[in-house]
Swiss-Prot record:
<dbReference type="InterPro" id="IPR036388">
    <property type="entry name" value="WH-like_DNA-bd_sf"/>
</dbReference>
<keyword id="KW-0614">Plasmid</keyword>
<dbReference type="InterPro" id="IPR000847">
    <property type="entry name" value="Tscrpt_reg_HTH_LysR"/>
</dbReference>
<dbReference type="Pfam" id="PF00126">
    <property type="entry name" value="HTH_1"/>
</dbReference>
<feature type="DNA-binding region" description="H-T-H motif">
    <location>
        <begin position="23"/>
        <end position="42"/>
    </location>
</feature>
<dbReference type="GO" id="GO:0003677">
    <property type="term" value="F:DNA binding"/>
</dbReference>
<keyword id="KW-0804">Transcription</keyword>
<keyword id="KW-0805">Transcription regulation</keyword>
<dbReference type="GO" id="GO:0003700">
    <property type="term" value="F:DNA-binding transcription factor activity"/>
</dbReference>
<comment type="function">
    <text>Positively regulates the transcription of the linD and linE genes that are involved in gamma-hexachlorocyclohexane (gamma-HCH or lindane) degradation. This degradation pathway allows S.japonicum UT26 to grow on gamma-HCH as the sole source of carbon and energy.</text>
</comment>
<dbReference type="InterPro" id="IPR005119">
    <property type="entry name" value="LysR_subst-bd"/>
</dbReference>
<keyword id="KW-0238">DNA-binding</keyword>
<dbReference type="Pfam" id="PF03466">
    <property type="entry name" value="LysR_substrate"/>
</dbReference>
<dbReference type="InterPro" id="IPR050389">
    <property type="entry name" value="LysR-type_TF"/>
</dbReference>
<keyword id="KW-0010">Activator</keyword>
<dbReference type="InterPro" id="IPR036390">
    <property type="entry name" value="WH_DNA-bd_sf"/>
</dbReference>
<comment type="similarity">
    <text>Belongs to the LysR transcriptional regulatory family.</text>
</comment>
Length: 303
């Protein structure tokens, strides 16, 4: 068997397999019986002379060859869609696609709820999947098409990556109403308080600068918990007497639900821009452009 024995149905399956890293998940997405998807993967492996997906600790992982061709496969499928539409005007209500959004937990909270609310009538057949990656992984995922858009503050995402400002974010300190620092807002009470710090180490996120500032200025004995998630940190803050320094707009809304109060940090915390990032090859893709425009519209208005 060689590559000439494959048709576009195999490319559709390959695209789903490389995005899902799972035969069963790809079969569900394409509404195929799992044996059919498994047989299709076997044909792809034989035709391309590569395993494509190999077993790993947490499921299956693509081979280097599979990662190298993922973007090409997606481009071929997009070209086929364009040819099938015969130059028709793009209409989101006919769009059937899952978009993959990379970012932190709070970015996903903002983006996924905003997109669901805004798109459920305009594009009822679209869906959205959240993915959390390191900075290096994010660039690669945008390049290969494994991720459609990244949302957050990632200053190092530059080579071949387009970007657009969504909104400005600043920091507040959150804690229980009776906490001495929450009552006073004074530097001495801030330094004397016990803190929970969120770490974004390895994610190339702008929050890293604030994390370093907190670790540099607060005595190590006062750093009681270092968490990897803002949402986990907020829940821990609610269950304790800890102070959490976090982005104001998103965490502030949730803090109200928990009954927490917010005050301005007594030490300088640089504000940052939340942006959306995408690869240049998607710049003129109609579905991708629609997603970016919708995201910009709803977030710049809501935030």
């Amino acid at each position: 068997m060689n590559i000439d024995d494959l048709d576009f149905r195999h490319l559709v399956l390959l695209d789903a397999l490389l995005k899902r890293h799972s035969v069963s998940a790809a079969a569900r997405e394409l509404d195929l019986p799992q044996p059919t998807a498994s047989h299709g993967l076997a044909r792809l492996r034989k035709a391309l002379g590569d395993p494509l997906l190999v077993r790993a600790r947490d499921g299956m992982e693509p081979t280097p060859r599979a990662e190298a061709i993922a973007g090409v496969v997606q481009q071929l499928l997009e070209l086929r869609r364009d040819l099938a539409e015969g130059g028709q005007t793009f209409s989101p209500d006919r769009l059937k696609r899952e978009f993959i959004i990379a970012g932190s937990d709070i970015a996903h909270l903002v983006v996924l709820t905003a997109l669901h609310s805004a798109a459920r009538f305009e594009a009822p057949h679209t869906s959205y999947r959240a993915l959390t990656l390191s900075g290096d992984e994010m660039v690669s995922a945008l390049e290969t098409g494994h991720v459609d858009i990244a949302v957050g503050a990632y200053p190092s995402l530059v080579a071949g990556i387009k970007t657009q400002r969504l909104y400005q974010e600043e920091y507040l300190c959150f804690g229980k109403e009776g906490h001495p620092f929450i009552k006073s807002g004074e530097t001495d009470d801030f330094m004397a308080a016990d803190h929970i710090v969120v770490s974004t180490k390895g994610m190339a996120h702008a929050h890293r600068a604030v994390e370093r500032a907190l670790l540099d200025k607060i005595h190590p004995d006062r750093i009681r918990i270092v968490a990897s998630s803002f949402l986990v940190a907020l829940a821990a803050c609610f269950e304790s007497d800890l102070i959490l320094t976090a982005p104001a707009r998103v965490i502030g809304r949730l803090a109200e639900v928990y009954g927490l109060r917010a005050v301005r940090p007594p030490i300088l915390m640089e504000a940052f821009e939340v942006r959306q990032y995408w690869h240049a090859r998607n710049q003129d893709d109609p579905p991708h452009r629609w997603l970016r425009q919708l995201l910009h519209k709803v977030l710049s208005a809501r935030m």
